[in-house]
Amino acid sequence: MADREWILLNPGPANTTPTVRAALVMPDLCHREPECFEMVRRCRDGLTRLAGAGNDWTAVLFAGSGTASVEAAICSAIPPGRAILVVDNGVYGDRMARIARAHGIPVETVRADMFTPIDPSAVDAALGARPEISHVAVVHHETTTGLLNPVAEIAKVAARRGRRVIVDAMSSLFGERLTIAADGLDFVTASANKCLQGIPGVSFVLCRRSAVEALADRSPRSVYLDLHTHYAQQERDNTPFTPAVQVLHALEQALAELEREGLDRRIARYAENARVLRDGMAGLGFEILVAGPGRSNILTTFRLLPGLTYDVLHDAMKRRGYIIYAGQGDIRTYAFRVSNMGTLTPADMNAVVHAFADSLKELGIEVGHRSVSTRQK
C-alpha cells in the first residue's frame, strides 16, 4: 500500500497522490493578494476546460463540501414564484428536495426506487402538468447505490418543455461520461475530493454563463451561498469570503494530474477497476443490487452474505487496511458499498477482492459463486 495508510473504498474523500497532499503544505498566502486570485482563475479555467464545457461556461468556486455547491445552485437558480422538479431515487435526490424546501421553494418530485434509473417520460409528464416549474434537479450518480440517472435524456425533455436543469454530478464528474454543454443543462455541481482526486473543502458549480448572469438582479436567498455573488466577485479577481487557500492549491495540482492522465484514461481506469472488483466479488458469492444498464463504474452496492453483518465485515477489512462503506437508508441492514474512485488501480482492486476473501475466511463465512448481475430483495 506504499504511501497509503488506508485504501479508501468509500465514495470520497478518495485516495490521492503524494503530490496532491504535498500541495497543501505551501507558503502562507493572503487570500486577497494577486497570487491567490491567479490561482483561483487557473482552477476555474482548468475545471471548465477539462470538463469539456466550452467558452460559454464558467466555474464558480465555494469553500465548503459538495452540498454547498448544490445548495448554491438550487437556492440561486429558482425565480421567486416558481417551483423545482426533483428526481428522487436516492438519498441525494431527497437532499436536493430538502434544500429547496428549506429556502421556501415549492417542490414537486418524480420518484423511482433506489435501484432504478428515472424514466425521462415521468419527468416529461410532471413538467407538462406543472407549468410553474422552472428547473429540474437530478443527481447523475446516486451514490446511495451506484445508480446512474439518464441526465442527457432528462435534459432533452426539459429543453423541449422550456425548462432548465441542475445536475448534482458530485461523484461522477471526471469519472463517468457527462456532456456538460448539453441542451437544457445550466448548472452542474461537484467537489474536489471525488473523481477529481483532490482534497475536501472546495466545491464548485459549472455554470452556463448566460444562466448565471441572468441572476444578477435576483434578491439572494442566502448570504454565503448566493451563486451570482461568488461569480461576480471571482470574475473581478475578488472573493466575497475567505476561500480555502491551501485546498485550492491542492485542487490545482489535482487538475494538473488529471490533465496528465487524460480524462478518457481516467474513466477507463475506473471502469476496469469496477470490472475487476465485480468479477472477483461475484466469485465470492456477493450479489450486486443495481442491474447492469443503470450501474455506474464508480461504486457498487453488494448484498451482505447470509450470517454476515456490515460492522463485522467493516472491522475485518479495516484490520487489513481497507475502508468499506455502509449502505444508506432502507438498505443499510442488508447491503454495503465499495467505491473504486481515486488513485486506485485494477491491481488494487484485485487486492481488495483477496482482502474480502481473507476476511470471510476469518469470520467463518461460506464463500460461493453467484451471478454478478442478479437482484432480488
Where are these regions (language model features)?
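PLP-dependent enzyme catalytic core of the Aspartate aminotransferase-like
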Residues: 1, 330, 334-377
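N-terminal "arm"/small-domain region of PLP-dependent enzymes with the aminotransferase-like
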Residues: 1-34
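Active-site C-terminal subdomain of aminotransferase-like
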Residues: 15-16, 193-279, 283
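Conserved N-terminal alpha-helix of the aminotransferase class I/II PLP-enzyme fold
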Residues: 23-72, 91, 95-101
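Conserved PLP-anchoring active-site segment centered on the Schiff-base-forming lysine
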Residues: 78-94
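Conserved active-site segment immediately N-terminal to the catalytic lysine
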Residues: 181-193
